[in-house]
Amino acid sequence: MTKAVLGIIGGSGIYDLPGLQDVREEAIKSPWGEPSSPVRHGIIAELPIVFMPRHDKGHRLSPSDINYRANIDVLKRAGVTDLVSLSACGSFKEELPPGMFVLVDQFVDRTHKRESSFFGKGCVAHVSMAHPVSPRLRIHLAAAAEAEDIAIARAGTYVCMEGPQFSTYAESMTYKNLGYSVIGMTNMPEAKLAREAEICYATVAMVTDFDCWHPDHDAVTMQDIIRVLASNADKAKNLVARLARIFPREHEPCPIGSDRALETALITAPEARDPELLKKLDAVAGRILRG
């Protein structure tokens, strides 16, 4: 079996990972452009960890400016088998107040400015996104949250907006009435690209606010969010430390086939594939293309 390597993407407020030992920073080059930052390799409880702050140190990148393809490509090159995204979000439900964590199990993509696939002209692939989150990862995250006494919902739908502006009231009410759980700006196309790269993916959505639908709460501001971010970040770091202690050391085959997603996805005939695109796909799809 393959050794497990746990990747952690830190969202707003999470720019480092305390407890990471034997830290080594590496600036990995990607044919897809510049990633958000160098990755940090390290160990927690003898488990290999690769950490990347999504917005870079100092939060210099807005959600629309992040090079999601380069980030996922770099994490794949770093050997990541399982990826946890720690992401701030707004809530559409009373039962998901600020400070609550949500183990997202579905996504709705409302972004419109981002490159959302590694594949295209010269090498076409269609991966399934019916079940975008690894159920195995969610089980381990739920166990870690319970052990740390962190309030967490076991499921929820995350709608990803383009940003960087927050929702209008009409948008907020529309998403609430559609039954969505939380809203954020970063998990798409991140989840899609992780699937194309055959990396098992899960999101911990960390509620900071009620967006702007709630009649008893003011419209969301960055000041409100920052007040909650620090507490959420501390809990998230404890969650990761606990997850590392209980996470299997061998990569377990994904029950929904996330780590084999390309086996039935490629449609372009070998003789019609673009050699230049194939070079860029060496990490993401090398297992299939070389096979």
Task: Mark where each language-model region is.
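Active-site/ligand-binding-proximal alpha/beta "capping" segment
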Residues: 147-181, 267
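His/Asp/Glu-rich mid-to-C-terminal helical/loop segments that flank catalytic regions of hydrolases
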Residues: 212-260
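Generic non-transmembrane alpha-helical segments
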Residues: 136, 140-151, 238-246
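Zn-dependent metallopeptidase/amidohydrolase metal-coordination segment
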Residues: 185-223
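Non-catalytic positions within long, well-ordered alpha-helices that form the structural scaffold/packing
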Residues: 76-79, 176, 195
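Short acidic/polar active-site loop segments enriched in Thr and Asp
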Residues: 81-82, 181, 200
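Metabolite-binding pocket within alpha/beta catalytic cores that recognizes anionic/polar moieties
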Residues: 1-130, 286-291
